[in-house]
Amino acid sequence: MYTIMLKAKLHMARVTHAVLDYEGSCAIDGELLDLAGIRENEQIQIYDVENGNRFTTYAIRGEAGSRLISINGAAAHQAQVGDRVIICSYAHYAEHELATHQPALVYLQDGNQISHTSHAIPVQFA
């Protein structure tokens, strides 16, 4: 049996472009893709913190170092420039992989600069 687990997350990215007439997808700065371990053409989920929209698309490589987050095609209706988004990818893991699985978490700050990275989400307290 396989379990779907969080593989990677870009937390609080800022949308820099929303291009309706582009072929589709989400262009992400290549450095951020590599750091998170998200592959080009990999399915991603995007959660817009500003409006609550959640949608699925795929990642394409943006210019390295540009800090680009471009929501393209029909998905451009779901997010606006300046919106904070959480970009996640998930993968299927076999039972024997679960004990050692650690997601790649990349936390971003203003200008989509890297704040820090982690492999565990902090425990939430009541």
UniProtKB/Swiss-Prot annotation:
Its cofactor is pyruvate. The active site is at residues 25, 58. It holds the Pfam family Asp_decarbox. It is found in: Cytoplasm. One of its GO terms (molecular function) is aspartate 1-decarboxylase activity. Substrate binds at residues 57, 73-75. Its EC number is 4.1.1.11. It is an enzyme of class 4 (lyase). Is synthesized initially as an inactive proenzyme, which is activated by self-cleavage at a specific serine bond to produce a beta-subunit with a hydroxyl group at its C-terminus and an alpha-subunit with a pyruvoyl group at its N-terminus. GO terms for cellular component: cytosol. Keywords: Autocatalytic cleavage, Cytoplasm, Decarboxylase, Lyase, Pantothenate biosynthesis, Pyruvate, Schiff base, Zymogen. The modification Pyruvic acid (Ser) is found at residue 25. Binds 1 pyruvoyl group covalently per subunit. Its main location: cytoplasm. GO terms for biological process: alanine biosynthetic process; pantothenate biosynthetic process. It catalyses: L-aspartate + H(+) = beta-alanine + CO2. Pathway: Cofactor biosynthesis; (R)-pantothenate biosynthesis; beta-alanine from L-aspartate: step 1/1. Belongs to the PanD family. Heterooctamer of four alpha and four beta subunits. Catalyzes the pyruvoyl-dependent decarboxylation of aspartate to produce beta-alanine. PANTHER family: ASPARTATE 1-DECARBOXYLASE. This is Aspartate 1-decarboxylase. It comes from Chromohalobacter salexigens (strain ATCC BAA-138 / DSM 3043 / CIP 106854 / NCIMB 13768 / 1H11). The lineage of its organism: Bacteria, Pseudomonadati, Pseudomonadota, Gammaproteobacteria, Oceanospirillales. The gene is panD.
